[in-house]
Amino acid sequence: MHLMSFDRMSGVNPAKNFNTISAVLDIGSDKIVCLIAKNTNIENHKGKFELLGLGHQRSSGFDHGSIVDPSTLELSIRKAIEDAEKMSSLTIDKITVNITSDKVESNLFEVSIPINDTQVTKKELDKALSIVTEQNFTSDKLIFETIPLGFSIDGVDLIEDPIGMYGEKLNINLNNLTCTKGIIQNIQNIVESAHVRVERIIFSPIASAVATLSSDEANLGSILVDMGAGTTSYSVFSDNIFRYAGVVPYGGNNITIDIARSLSISLRDAEKLKILYGGVLTNSYDNGEVVKIRQLGFQEDTGSEKQIQKSTIADISRTRALDTLERVRVAIENISPSLLYQKRVILTGGGSQLIGIDDLASEIFQSPVRRAIPKAISQDFDVSDPIFSNACGMLTYSQNETFVNKKITTKGLSYFQGNNFFSSLMRWFKDNF
């Protein structure tokens, strides 16, 4: 299957989106971030948004990409949105939300449409979307996004916009993102219980890639790994093409739990140890340095402290980080070993701040590795922290309205039927990569 270049994929219509207000909500296991911004479409190194509001709350009731306590999660979401609204002096009624579940599937399709020496019209493109929806429909899953990747007519590729062209057969390559119906419906319900309508759902590893990858990295081949608290998500790019994305249900919180269990200490103390001494290069602490920590179940000043070698903490952290990154590598290899070939690895997210994680990732993937912060999106606020990569990418990615799925139905999503559905999408990727 031939996939088209990101350089031919589209973007927002400046005339349409200029000065529009957008809101995004990044729901994670550790934090919830709400951004409200105005799209200025002014291209410079400071970004093309005026960031109006930022809400940042500790997450509660959400773990490993799933809702585990709706009532407490609703309160966290409501507070993050309220904080962003207060800062912006605006009240929002719709929002873009992320999904970071290992139940999301990324499926490639090639659809052939006979055109019989007539002109390609919007009708043929709509037919292709309908075919993919029918092929990918199951009663327990929903399509939440379809990404067109490229076109060819009679075997000739490099067609940016096929509308108006003649030929015998039109081939369209698409990537369908699907997820278990209950997960999507639960996300919608919990957000809308805060009196905000879910306008769109975005897969987190794609958003993180938009926020962190350079054009050269997307072109030459890269694997983006977003190391969150409850999950680690990844997306693969080469030749400026989005190839694949997925999630493994392990993250930084698993390191904390491992430390707590192994050392018989509280989760709170384990988190402190992870932050202070949780590097993954064990030889950094081979000089026998120790740290004192209170044993689980004892109060302070009761003689319950015990000494723990820093190298022990690093060993525990390394074991879990290695397992998580290896799961990512194996998942990509199982799709296609070629996806790993000559790919640079880019790490982001809170877990990417672990000391030595870049060296460990280089060992596992046998590739160059860099740690990334999100590219500047606004000159008003500094969100250049890897924990904001997903939220920043969501803000940029959400500006493409040409393939927004407007309404979830029993067969997936009813697609926005714009006149330049595919060509607009291709321009967006060209503008943002």
Q: Residue ranges of each PLM-predicted region?
A:
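Conserved phosphate-binding/catalytic loops in two-lobed NTP-binding clefts
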Residues: 122, 126, 364-392
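Hydrophobic alpha-helical bundle architecture
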Residues: 331-339, 343-350, 364, 370-379
